[in-house]
Amino acid sequence: MARTDKWKVPEPGIDDRLTSLPDEIISHILSFLPTKYAVGTAVLSRRWKDLWTRVSNLDFDNRLVYRDLISSRVANYFRLTEMEDRRRDVEFLRFVDRVFSQHRNLDSVRCFRFHVSVSRAMQDYLNKRGLAFGSQVEEIDVMLLEAIVSQLCLQLPESFYTLKNLKVAKLHEVKATVNGSVSLPSLKILELWDVLAEDRESLSRLITGCPILETLRLEHCILLDMNENDVLIASIPSLRNLTIIAFLAEDDDKCLCRIAMEAPKLEHLYLEDFTELEFLCSSSPLPCLDSARVDTGRRASSYQSLVRLLAQISSAKEMCLYWNTLVMNIFPLLHKLHYLLVV
C-alpha cells in the first residue's frame, strides 16, 4: 500500500520550528507535559535525550500506568490482577527514582505534582524516601487516593513547613503533625482535602505560619486529638477566601470541630455541613464581606452558633442560604444585601 502524504518523513532542509529552538525553551515547553511524557521525548534524537532533565515542573501520576496496562491487555481497570497491580506500582516507583536521580537540579523545580493511588508498596516507598520537595518549589499538589480508607496515610515531611518560596499548597489525604515552628512566608493558597491533623495545635501552627495567606480550604479534614469542648483558634489577618466543608473531630461523622478565627479582611465565605465558626474581630459584622454561602447540611448545628454566625456575616452583599438554614427561622438585619439566593 502506498504511503500517504500524512506519514511522509520531512525532507532534509525543511524547517523544524521546534527543533530549531534553544534547549532552554524546549525544556520549558516539556515542563507543561506530565513527566512520563516529557521523559518519553528522550527517544526522539541524541539532542533530545537529556532535555527533559531540565524541566521546571515534575508531574507524577500513576494512573497513567493504569492506562498503559489497560490498553496493552484490552482489559477493564477493575479486572487487573493483584500481580498486575503490584507490577504497576513497581514500574511507577522505578520511574520516579529514575527522574529524581537524573534530573539536573531538583532545587530548580518550581511545581511538584504527585497524584497516586496508595498501596502498601507505595506507602513503604514513601515512608522510606519521603516526598522530595526542592527548596525553591512554588507549588505543591499532592493527592494520595484511597489513603484514609486503606489506613495508609503519609506523614508530611518536616521540610514542607519551612519552604520559603511556596505559594500554593494543595494536599489530599495526608497526615499533618507539626512538632516545630512553621514558616511559610510566601504561601497564599492552602487547600486541604481529607487531611488528618494530629491535634489542633498542629493545624493552628500550620495556618498561622502563613502570614500572607489569602485562600484557605478545609474539606472533610479531621482533627485526631480533639473533643467537642475544644476550640481551634487561628489568626489570619490577610485571609480573603474561606471554604469549610464538614470539618470533623476524632473521625466522628457527627462531631464538628469548633473554630474561632480572626479574619478581618474576609471577602468570600462558603460553609457546607459546618457552622461551628466564630469570627474574632473588633467590628461585627465582618466589614469586608462580599459573599456568603451557608448550608448547615445533615449534621446538627447548635442554635446559638448559627445565630452568632448569621449575625457576623450579615454585612454580605450577596448571600446564598439553603432550606435547612431557613427552617431555623433566625435572621438578623441584612442591611447591605443586594442579592439573595435560596436553595
Specify the residue positions occupied by each region the protein language model found.
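Innate immune receptor modules and recognition interfaces
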Residues: 15, 27, 97, 132, ...
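A structural signal for leucine-rich repeat
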Residues: 127-131, 155-163, 180-188, 203-212, ...
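Leucine-rich repeat
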Residues: 2-6, 11-233
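Right-handed parallel beta-helix
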Residues: 194, 214-215, 240-243, 267-268
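Extended alpha-solenoid helical-repeat scaffolds
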Residues: 224, 243-245
